[in-house]
Amino acid sequence: MTTVNSNIRDNCKREKAARFLSENLCPDAVLSVASAYFTVQAYDQLREKLDAIASMRFLFGDPDYVNKIDPEKTASKRFAIVNNGLDLKDALRQKAAVKGCAEWIRAKVEIKSVINRALLHGKLYHIAPPGRDSRAMFGSSNFTTRGLGLADSQNNIELNMEITDQRDRDDLL
């Protein structure tokens, strides 16, 4: 698929949201994220870059969102696992990814939650590299494999914009 040169990241013709992170994350950077969802699989695919950052500040949607997705707890767990892109061949690798992610969170991540009746909808990725201007992207991509365009197939079609004005990037924090 050919890509279009643009500051839009849509996981289709205008690059993947993950590319913004991969190209801009660097050792000792501070990453600030606002997202309603976070998956270990997304961390695992960006692990090399994320392990090298100084810290991450994560503004998370209501932590009770899991219960809101299936309040009657009727959804098939098998379906949920398959729908999230997991299968048996990944089970052993997933255990190591979960352990690595937990260690990374304990060492580098500060998590704050939005406790409100309304859901956190806006997403933000702000990178402050040492000694350089910050970088930022905001839009619709959650910190998930499909949201960031990291899935092998069926990535979400998103609408994110890389912010090119330094004043606007500073205002986002």
Residue ranges of each PLM-predicted region?
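PLD/PLD-like phosphodiesterase catalytic module centered on the HKD motif
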Residues: 1-173
